[in-house]
């Protein structure tokens, strides 16, 4: 705090607690809390992270932990204690508890101890997962208060701990900003280093941004905190967000809004599912263009953003700058793994709006899990990073023919070699999540853990087998391009030796001898790299201590203390530049050799948890981070303390023999250290030089000056070893981070190989075929099947053929009974096209597909209660969107358009939609239209590119049998009553419905679309610029006065005709009576 802020803080405490003396720890807690009022503050106290006041009540309720009370102040001049609520969680379980708090929508700030008391034995405990690399410093002088500092702020979009993240999904942080009709969107996954940005413009910008957010499904979204927060076209979710923000103060708007008002409402918004993510409203000043540009230049270590494609995208720059600033703020430092950004455009991939993603059940089934979804079928991956990549491919299919054919070639390679496929998939099981592990290591020892090193080592151990299996095969490289990492590459080029181990993307991996350079030269190289990246000289240039191989010093406290204070790493940091590895997959043999030398076989989970000196106590096995022989200084300190430990271990038998006390015992605990315990019955035999330490009911505990001296040697050695271990670990992280680009390229190549092998496995299991892709608008599927439905059926799935193009078969109008499979056919066609464009084989006997730029679906609907929209309104909104955004290369799937209103209204709208798609010059796209309006089949006579199909059914013994076959021609019946009977409708209702249906069919003439007046305008053929004249049909079906087909709207008879002709105003009472008699007579003889 600044002096002014400190004075204001003190005044606030005096006003809040008049007449109270606050304890020092509580003042410290309130000071930290004041700096982070929007977060739950976890305050480290010994083995627990404690929360106080309102935070404690909230944590106790959410996490179901005990709420207690702790003294925090005393009354001046009185012996009256003041207590506050307190709830704590153990440090070793903090990760799981924090995940629950963040999942509930709260920010969590971690306040860690930064200093230790010299006399405290408990401060050598390991750090938590969130502060693994934080180095404590000893308190000096008379200060008794341990310093604490917030080291991390954890929010839904900034989690980097693997244990808190789903392995198979990315955890995106997104930033969204709109200005003058343009929208900038950036997103990053801090756990993998993925960073990308896009800018939308034009009248479709809002819809495109909404679709991209739906694809990403970010965990957290940053938006500017301002009055015009609403983004046009992103209704209704952003509208509701704006309404909620109006209830908050400006300070509250800057918080991560925790689910109470916003998430509860927006989760009901089915058509904008991204909105259920947590929203953080940031003040508008943080989105300043100049500030954002400077932030990115510094982050990437470059002088211009033109090389990333950002020069002419100001809103993308502002969004990306907000991502980096927010990440730095929450990580409380730099974000080393965001070293490049990928800029892309809306036309790079197939467009899938939120409705299509939901209707086709791409990533989630109806259950909210992957069961019943496309990814549930295709995901045969063996690594978490492969699973994440497959999800990205499914949500962002390609439109580039060359890249698609390369992907199909790769899948074909694995399909045709079962032995290779099995070998690669078995080897991939051993790789794990190398991508996230490498990203944690790149971020340094403050994030990486010893277990991360062990996981990376285990992954690299599998690479030689993978390289050998793949031999000379080269997978497509488009998904592993890291050429944008120019900052790291430029920095590596500055080094005197190839310390950073970065191979530029275009370099040939030529053979070269490993280079070993002196530690001094390596320090100088690192210093210049560090200065270039951060502007700071992080490494000193002191001389290396040339004391390797010297005999261990005598076990004195001075020896141990001196070794710790002057320690410099004496191990040689190797060059991690590539050494002639495979051009396809770098086995990273030199990196593996380095890790094998540096990291012990089974390191503890966290730094500070090693037991270099007390291994064997209570049956504990030796565990250490640094392998013996790697860091001589650690080995010297261990050796220097061995004699002290040996002396202590030999003390018990010596003292028993010298004193004659056979039950004398020498032992240790963390509170009192080493002691000599003597039972009370031998009190008179205790030597005079024994000094009493503790009295027990059964005896006394003592120590001697000599035992105390050796105890200090052991304790100081333990602390020095922890310090040396932390320093050595930081250097190891630093060396590996220098090879970060190389390791990331390897990890992402492995992920790509994993996806190809998985798609091949799915193809073999599902009997899929390779699709043929073309740069036109054909769509020919022979023996097509639904990839998900066929796996859930007990019986054989009935395949179907379909053939479309925009010249002769643009629209397929499908009629047929309920439950006959119309919706399945619609979805399977869309899924087959999508699967082909992610690089997968498809469930068919053969498939020829012209590249689809967008898939639109209008399948099913329900009332949108949250926004007050009826089923029909939802249906019409979605239909309007697809009609406005489709192109001649799109694929439209329409199921039961018009069913949400009256019969004639619905049929009129359905016919008008068909005509618009058929006749509109901008459209003319491939369309599958399923309907129960059988009258629409007559449009085949007047719309030349519309063809009728129906789902076949037959009757056997009075029951309908669905054949699930798509056949040419229109259906003549819907069999709705049969379906009602199958659903369990009572028999009296079924019988009455049958009677009414027969009556309606007998009396009501069939409504048939009538030919429309011939149009005179010229219209190009579908998807072509050439104009031609045509006649379009637009029939106007007969309409009841209320627009609704009625059960009683029958054919008029003589009685009705007579009534219509009567002029009641001109009739006398006698004439009226006579007319009534005539009408009654006509009715009795059946004149209707």
UniProtKB/Swiss-Prot annotation:
Q: Does the keyword ATP-binding apply?
A: yes
List, alphabetically, the SMART domains matched. MUTSac, MUTSd
Any single GO molecular-function term of the entry would be: ATP binding
Please give the residue ranges the record annotates as the region Disordered. Answer: 498-579, 1000-1048
Q: Which Pfam families match?
A: MutS_I, MutS_II, MutS_III, MutS_IV, MutS_V
Q: Which residues does the annotation say bind ATP?
A: 816-823
Keywords for the protein's UniProt record, in alphabetical order: ATP-binding, DNA damage, DNA repair, DNA-binding, Nucleotide-binding
* Gene Ontology cellular component terms for the protein in this record: cytosol
Is Oxidoreductase included in the keywords of this UniProt record?
Answer: no
Compositionally skewed regions (Acidic residues) per UniProt = 537-546
Q: Which GO terms describe its biological process?
A: mismatch repair
User: Which InterPro entries would you find in this protein's record?
Assistant: DNA_mismatch_repair_MutS, DNA_mismatch_repair_MutS-lik_N, DNA_mismatch_repair_MutS/MSH, DNA_mismatch_repair_MutS_C, DNA_mismatch_repair_MutS_clamp, DNA_mismatch_repair_MutS_core, DNA_mismatch_repair_MutS_N, DNA_mismatch_repair_MutS_sf
Role, per record = This protein is involved in the repair of mismatches in DNA. It is possible that it carries out the mismatch recognition step. This protein has a weak ATPase activity.
NCBIfam families on file: PRK05399.1 (NF003810)
Q: What family does this belong to?
A: Belongs to the DNA mismatch repair MutS family.
Protein name per the record: DNA mismatch repair protein MutS
Name the lineage: Bacteria, Bacillati, Chloroflexota, Chloroflexia, Chloroflexales
């Amino acid at each position: 705090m600044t002096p002014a802020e400190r004075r204001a803080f003190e005044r606030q405490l005096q006003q809040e607690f008049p007449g109270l003396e606050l304890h020092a720890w509580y003042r410290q807690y309130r000071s930290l809390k004041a700096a982070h009022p929007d977060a739950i503050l976890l305050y480290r106290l010994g083995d627990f992270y404690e929360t106080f006041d309102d935070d404690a009540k909230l944590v106790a309720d959410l996490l179901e932990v005990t709420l207690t009370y702790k003294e925090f102040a005393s009354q001046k001049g009185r012996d009256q204690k003041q207590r506050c609520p307190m709830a704590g969680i153990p440090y070793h379980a903090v990760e799981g508890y924090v995940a629950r708090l963040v999942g509930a929508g709260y920010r969590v700030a971690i306040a860690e101890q930064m200093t230790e008391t010299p006399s405290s034995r408990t401060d050598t405990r390991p750090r938590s997962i969130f502060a693994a690399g934080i180095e404590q410093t000893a308190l000096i002088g008379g200060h008794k208060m341990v310093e604490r500092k917030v080291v991390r702020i954890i929010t839904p979009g900034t989690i980097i701990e693997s244990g808190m993240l789903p392995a198979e999904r990315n955890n995106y942080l997104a930033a969204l900003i709109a200005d003058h009709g343009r929208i900038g969107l950036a997103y990053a996954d801090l756990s993998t280093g993925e960073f990308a940005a896009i800018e939308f413009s034009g009248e479709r910008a809002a819809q495109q941004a909404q679709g991209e957010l739906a694809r990403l499904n970010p965990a957290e979204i940053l938006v500017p905190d301002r009055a015009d927060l609403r983004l046009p076209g992103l209704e209704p979710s952003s509208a509701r967000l704006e309404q909620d923000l109006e209830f908050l103060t400006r300070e509250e708007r800057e918080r991560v809004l925790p689910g109470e008002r916003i998430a509860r409402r927006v989760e009901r918004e089915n058509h904008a599912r991204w909105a259920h993510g947590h929203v953080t409203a940031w003040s508008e000043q943080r989105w300043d263009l100049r500030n954002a540009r400077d932030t990115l230049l510094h982050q990437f270590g470059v002088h211009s953003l033109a090389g990333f494609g950002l020069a002419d995208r100001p809103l993308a720059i502002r969004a990306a700058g907000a991502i980096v600033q927010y990440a730095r703020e929450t990580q409380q430092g730099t974000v080393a793994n965001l070293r490049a950004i990928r800029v892309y455009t809306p036309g790079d991939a197939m467009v899938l709006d939120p409705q299509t993603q939901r209707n086709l059940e791409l990533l989630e089934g109806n259950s909210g899990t992957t069961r019943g979804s496309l990814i549930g079928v295709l995901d045969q991956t063996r690594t978490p990073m492969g699973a994440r990549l497959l999800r990205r491919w499914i949500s962002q299919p390609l439109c580039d023919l060359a890249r698609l054919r390369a992907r199909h070639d790769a899948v074909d390679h694995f399909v045709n070699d079962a032995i290779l496929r099995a070998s690669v998939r078995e080897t991939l099981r051993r790789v794990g999540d190398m991508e996230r592990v490498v990203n944690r290591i790149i971020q340094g020892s403050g994030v990486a853990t010893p277990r991360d090193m062990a996981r990376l080592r285990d992954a690299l151990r599998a690479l030689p087998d993978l390289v050998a299996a793949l031999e000379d095969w080269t997978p497509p490289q488009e998904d592993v391009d890291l050429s944008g990492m120019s900052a790291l590459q430029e920095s590596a080029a500055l080094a005197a030796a190839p310390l950073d181990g970065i191979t530029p993307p275009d370099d040939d991996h030529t053979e070269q001898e490993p280079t070993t350079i002196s530690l001094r030269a390596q320090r100088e190289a690192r210093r210049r790299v560090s200065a270039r990246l951060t502007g700071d000289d992080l490494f000193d240039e002191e001389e290396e201590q040339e004391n390797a191989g010297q005999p261990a010093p005598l076990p004195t406290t001075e020896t141990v203390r001196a070794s710790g204070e002057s320690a410099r790493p004496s191990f040689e940091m190797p060059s991690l530049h590539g050494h002639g590895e495979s051009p396809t997959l770098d086995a990273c043999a030199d990196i593996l050799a380095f890790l094998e030398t540096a990291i012990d076989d089974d390191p503890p989970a966290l730094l500070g948890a090693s037991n270099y000196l007390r291994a064997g106590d209570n049956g504990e096995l030796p565990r250490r981070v640094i392998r013996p022989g790697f860091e001589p200084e650690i080995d010297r300190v261990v050796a220097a303390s061995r004699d002290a430990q040996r002396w202590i271990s030999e003390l018990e038998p010596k003292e028993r023999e010298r004193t004659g006390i056979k039950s004398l015992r020498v032992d240790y605990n963390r509170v009192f250290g080493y002691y000599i315990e003597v039972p009370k019955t031998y009190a008179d035999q205790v030597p005079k030089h024994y000094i009493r330490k503790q009295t027990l009911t059964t005896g006394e505990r003592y120590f001697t000056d000599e035992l105390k001296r050796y105890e200090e040697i052991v304790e100081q050695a333990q602390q020095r070893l922890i310090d040396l271990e932390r320093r050595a670990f930081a250097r190891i992280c630093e060396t590996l981070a220098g090879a970060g680009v190389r390791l990331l390229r390897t990890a992402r190549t492995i992920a790509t190989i994993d996806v190809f092998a998985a798609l091949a496995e799915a193809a073999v299991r599902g009997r899929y075929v390779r699709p043929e892709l073309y740069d036109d608008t054909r769509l020919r599927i022979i023996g097509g099947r639904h990839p998900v439905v066929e796996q859930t059926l007990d019986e054989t799935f009935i395949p179907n053929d379909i053939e479309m193009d925009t010249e002769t078969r643009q629209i397929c109008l499908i009629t047929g009974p309920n439950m006959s499979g119309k919706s399945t056919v619609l979805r399977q066609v869309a899924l087959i096209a999508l699967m082909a464009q992610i690089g997968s084989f498809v469930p068919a006997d053969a498939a020829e597909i012209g590249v689809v730029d967008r898939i639109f679906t209008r399948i099913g609907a329900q009332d949108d209660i949250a926004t007050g929209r009826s089923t029909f309104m939802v249906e019409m909104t979605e239909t309007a969107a697809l009609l406005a955004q489709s192109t001649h290369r799109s694929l439209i799937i329409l199921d039961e358009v018009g069913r949400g209103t009256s019969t004639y209204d619905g049929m009129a709208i359905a016919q008008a939609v068909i005509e618009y798609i058929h006749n509109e010059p901008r459209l003319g796209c491939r369309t599958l239209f399923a309907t129960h309006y059988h009258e629409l089949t007559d449009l085949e006579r007047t719309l030349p590119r519309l063809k009728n199909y129906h789902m076949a059914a037959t009757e056997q013994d009075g029951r309908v049998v669905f054949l699930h076959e798509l056949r040419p021609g229109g259906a003549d019946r819907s069999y709705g009553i049969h379906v009602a009977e199958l659903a369990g409708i009572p028999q009296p209702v079924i019988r009455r419905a049958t009677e009414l249906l027969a009556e309606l069919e007998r009396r009501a003439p069939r409504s048939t679309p009538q030919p429309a007046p011939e149009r005179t305008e010229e219209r190009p053929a579908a998807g072509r610029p050439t104009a031609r004249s045509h006649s379009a049909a637009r029939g106007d079906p007969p309409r009841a006065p209320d627009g609704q087909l009625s059960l009683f709207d029958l054919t008029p008879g003589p009685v009705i005709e007579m009534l219509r002709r009567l002029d009641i105003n001109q009739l006398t009472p006698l004439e009226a009576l006579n007319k009534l008699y005539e009408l009654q007579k006509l009715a009795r003889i059946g004149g209707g």
